[in-house]
């Protein structure tokens, strides 16, 4: 009996490991989203224009995923997304430079020929001017005065000539 159980257990283990794709698709099993590389979208690529400097391209696109030491004129951006165990989607774009200026774009994205119109997210709020009868200081000092008018008492100014006459 022991001699037949061991080969059956080994055969069952080998058979189950071959069913990895079946085990990945079991209902109720959570699979994480896997994103790798530079996140690239069409809005970023639409901002690229010929003769842009490398610094401007870095500001728009971020650091390239690959900079080949043998092809310094070429920057490669790769993005891979595999949401929840589904099929992997990979996008790439290569930018070509002549010296410091952008001369070409190649890959899954193409810049549009329309100018980029950026919608403003700023809003202006008009706050109406408040009509204050009294300042805070006038209100505080008005609590201690006997005057019903609420005005602050004014100290008469003494002139230097008045001091000499005394």
From Swiss-Prot:
Compartments, as annotated in UniProt: Cell outer membrane
Source taxon at top rank: Bacteria
GO molecular function: protein-macromolecule adaptor activity
Membrane topology: Lipid-anchor
PROSITE patterns hit by this protein: PROKAR_LIPOPROTEIN
UniProt-listed GO biological process terms: Gram-negative-bacterium-type cell outer membrane assembly; protein insertion into membrane
Region (Disordered): 143-166
Keywords in alphabetical order: Cell outer membrane, Lipoprotein, Membrane, Palmitate, Signal
Main location: membrane
Chain residues carrying a lipid of type N-palmitoyl cysteine: 19
GO cellular component: Bam protein complex
Classification via Pfam families: BamE
Lipidation (S-diacylglycerol cysteine): 19
Family the entry assigns: Belongs to the BamE family.
Subunit structure: Part of the Bam complex.
The protein's role, per its UniProt record: Part of the outer membrane protein assembly complex, which is involved in assembly and insertion of beta-barrel proteins into the outer membrane.
Name of protein: Outer membrane protein assembly factor BamE
Origin species: Methylomonas methanica (strain DSM 25384 / MC09)
